[in-house]
Amino acid sequence: MKRVFGVFGDPVGHSLSPAMHNSAFSALGMDCIYHAFRVRPENLRKAILGAEAMGFGGLNLTVPLKEEALKLDFIRPDPLAERIGAVNTVVFSETGEIRGYNTDGLGARQALLEAAVEIRGSKVVVAGAGGAARAVAFQLAADGAEITVVNRTEERAVELAKDVAAASLPGKINGTGLSGLKELLRDADILINTTTLGMHPNTDTTIATAEELHSGLTVFDIVYNPLETRLLKEAKVAGAKTVSGVLMLVYQGAEAFKLWTGVEAPAELMKKTVLEALQA
């Protein structure tokens, strides 16, 4: 019988994780299948315990479940996930433990490195203060970036900045409201959108327009559906370098794949699969 893996979230119909992971399982000759499951926050406890009872191999968690997972007393988060305050990967261990990890930050870091973007010393604006933003902020602070988190609710941005600062990482960080975004972008080296603005089906929304961007900027949108979000289109008009959310999706997925199986994931194949699905 095939071993089942999956992604829990709401909404989750847009997810390309099933195509990506199923291509990897197939290429490696593994008798496994990966599905997307719509799960609301109030049902997360039952859903994860149900998956364990049915012998699932592992799970990914996406919006809005990453932070909710840490509230569950049966999940054993690793130190990084606990520090970030969000779990995106669940492993059902042979000892019976349900372990929580966060691979989002590593995925974002690898995406920037593949695009030949210098992180250390760069001035980075992170838009959003949710689970993905926390992962990105902790990772880039560890890599020595100077980060400003901007969020519609300023208190959440400030709280995130305080959490990262308390970890005594090499980078610097502060938080502010969205009203300061335009001014911050003038001096920024990297803009990372971790909000859902621009995600299908609301593809005409964006955190910033071409007039607010500049050619010395790298614009990284973690939204990957559509492949070219409105933010990335605006960035191209401004002459900025762009980094697709596909890369973060692939590299966080590759990290999760290895945690579940102990096997190196075929990342290039996974990227090819995602790009083909988005361009279909």
From Swiss-Prot:
Q: Which GO terms describe its biological process?
A: amino acid biosynthetic process; aromatic amino acid family biosynthetic process; chorismate biosynthetic process; shikimate metabolic process
Q: Which residues bind shikimate?
A: 15-17, 62, 88, 104, 224
Q: Which residues does the record give as NADP(+) binding sites?
A: 128-132, 151-156, 222, 245
The catalytic residues are 66 (proton acceptor)
Catalytic activity, per the record?
shikimate + NADP(+) = 3-dehydroshikimate + NADPH + H(+)
GO molecular-function term, one example from the UniProt record: shikimate 3-dehydrogenase (NADP+) activity
The EC number of this protein is 1.1.1.25
What are the record keywords, sorted?
Amino-acid biosynthesis, Aromatic amino acid biosynthesis, NADP, Oxidoreductase
What InterPro entries does the database record attribute to this sequence? Aminoacid_DH-like_N_sf, NAD(P)-bd_dom_sf, SDH_C, Shikimate_DH, Shikimate_DH-bd_N, Shikimate_DH_fam, Shikm_DH/Glu-tRNA_Rdtase
| Pathway note | Metabolic intermediate biosynthesis; chorismate biosynthesis; chorismate from D-erythrose 4-phosphate and phosphoenolpyruvate: step 4/7
Instruction: Identify the PANTHER family for this entry.
Output: BIFUNCTIONAL 3-DEHYDROQUINATE DEHYDRATASE_SHIKIMATE DEHYDROGENASE, CHLOROPLASTIC, SHIKIMATE DEHYDROGENASE
Family in the record: Belongs to the shikimate dehydrogenase family.
Assembly, in brief, is: Homodimer.
Q: What does this protein do?
A: Involved in the biosynthesis of the chorismate, which leads to the biosynthesis of aromatic amino acids. Catalyzes the reversible NADPH linked reduction of 3-dehydroshikimate (DHSA) to yield shikimate (SA).
Q: Which HAMAP family match?
A: Shikimate_DH_AroE (MF_00222)
This protein is called: Shikimate dehydrogenase (NADP(+))
Q: Which gene encodes it?
A: aroE
